[in-house]
Amino acid sequence: MKKLFLDANVLFSAAWREDSGLWRLGKLPKAKLLTSGYAVEEARRNLDDDEQKRRLTMFLSKIEIVPDCPDQILPVKLAEKDLPILQAAIGHRADFLVTGDHRHFGALFGKNVGGVRIISPADVMKRFD
């Protein structure tokens, strides 16, 4: 079973729209979903209404929330707000970091960083669906 660490923007997007295809991630039979408390709080902070927050809570019921790993050394430079995401993915030995953040992770897409391959949600569905 592969461990998929979900970035805050994936959590946010799943909660934003009731019909988001990201809900399919929770049904992948060969994947274990992880995220961190930091990612959850970032997603929650950016949601506007109670219905979206309710959907986030429902989506999180399919995901293991792991501790942050602030002492994890990173082999790459990232924006300050993205450091805890990659640190937790590496620290918890995720196979993949799933993110839609092309602005900050774009140059790293498809690459292994500290043992974690950075991919988009669409790439996950191609690999696992």
Predicted regions and their residues:
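Metal-dependent nucleic-acid phosphoesterase active-site entry motif
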Residues: 1-19
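PIN/NYN-family metal-dependent endoribonuclease catalytic core
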Residues: 6, 18-48
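Short, structured coil segments at secondary-structure junctions
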Residues: 29, 61, 112-114
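Residue-level detector of structured alpha->beta connecting loops
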Residues: 30, 64, 93-94
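Short secondary-structure boundary segments
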Residues: 37, 100-102
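Acidic catalytic patch
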Residues: 57-77
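Acidic, PIN/NYN-like endoribonuclease modules and their adjacent C-terminal/linker elements
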Residues: 76, 83, 103-129
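Acidic, metal-associated active-site segment
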Residues: 80-97
